[in-house]
């Protein structure tokens, strides 16, 4: 496990209460072993962090996208707080190197498990909120999510809807999605999905069916528009 200084540098925030940081990084697998120093895990913080993230992302969108209607704002928010986006943020922070977990969880692939990375990212947001205030947390989220705020159109944040609308307008055919295969352990499976519109097909993979479908829709839409 890495020291916390590098993580705090990436965050742009230094914790006053390091125990909050430790709790946010502690995997629930630690509960079963008395010899571990930490008797708390990230689950409660994750619960709070999910709510804080949703609130602040909503506020940021409300202020920055003044001309967007509620429906479009809701779609953008769904994209910004979805598992895939949160995992990307957590991966850029290299959170897998900081998660405190049992050897058994690590051997089972726990450090690369998208669920763990998502959970720790949300727990970390809650820890920052409790250690500081809503304004500081707002600024950190705005910085970490900055590149995702550059959405240009529906394709960026809702490729499945964009593909469906394009397909209906161009060919009167709805996209058809099919799960081709699932590989890997139950907690870290990789899904391969095919999407088809008329005679065009696209295959993509993801850590969830939803992620794979979004990737496939985005790639196929790009092909169709440039064909």
Curated annotation (Swiss-Prot):
EC annotation from Swiss-Prot or TrEMBL: 3.1.26.3
UniProt-listed Gene3D superfamilies: 3.30.160.20, Ribonuclease III domain (1.10.1520.10)
Subcellular location(s) per record: Cytoplasm
Biological process per Gene Ontology, one example term: mRNA processing
Superkingdom of the organism of origin: Bacteria
Residues annotated as transmembrane: none
CC annotations in GO: cytoplasm
Reaction equation(s) it catalyzes: Endonucleolytic cleavage to 5'-phosphomonoester
Catalytic residues in the record: 50, 122
Cofactor(s) it depends on: Mg(2+)
Family: Belongs to the ribonuclease III family.
HAMAP family reported for this sequence: RNase_III
Protein name per UniProt: Ribonuclease 3
């Amino acid at each position: 496990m890495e020291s916390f200084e590098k993580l705090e540098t990436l965050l742009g925030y230094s914790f006053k209460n390091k125990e909050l940081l430790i709790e946010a990084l502690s995997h629930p697998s630690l509960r079963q072993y008395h010899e571990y120093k930490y008797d708390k895990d990230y689950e409660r913080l994750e619960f709070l962090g999910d709510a804080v993230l949703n609130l602040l992302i909503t506020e940021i969108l409300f202020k920055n996208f003044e001309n967007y209607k509620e429906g479009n704002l809701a779609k953008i928010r769904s994209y910004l707080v979805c598992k895939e986006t949160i995992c990307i943020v957590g991966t850029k922070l290299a959170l897998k190197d900081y998660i405190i977990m049992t050897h058994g969880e690590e051997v089972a692939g726990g450090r690369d498990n998208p669920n763990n990375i998502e959970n720790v990212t949300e727990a970390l947001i809650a820890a920052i909120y409790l250690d500081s205030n809503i304004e500081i947390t707002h600024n950190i989220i705005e910085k970490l999510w900055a590149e995702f705020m550059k959405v240009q159109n529906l394709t960026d944040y809702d490729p499945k809807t964009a593909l469906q609308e394009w397909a209906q307008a161009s060919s009167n055919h709805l996209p058809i999605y099919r799960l081709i295969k699932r590989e890997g352990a139950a907690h870290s499976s990789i899904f391969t999905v095919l999407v088809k519109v008329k005679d065009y097909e696209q295959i993509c993979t993801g850590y969830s069916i939803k992620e794979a479908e979004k990737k496939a829709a985005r790639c196929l839409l790009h092909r169709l528009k440039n064909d």
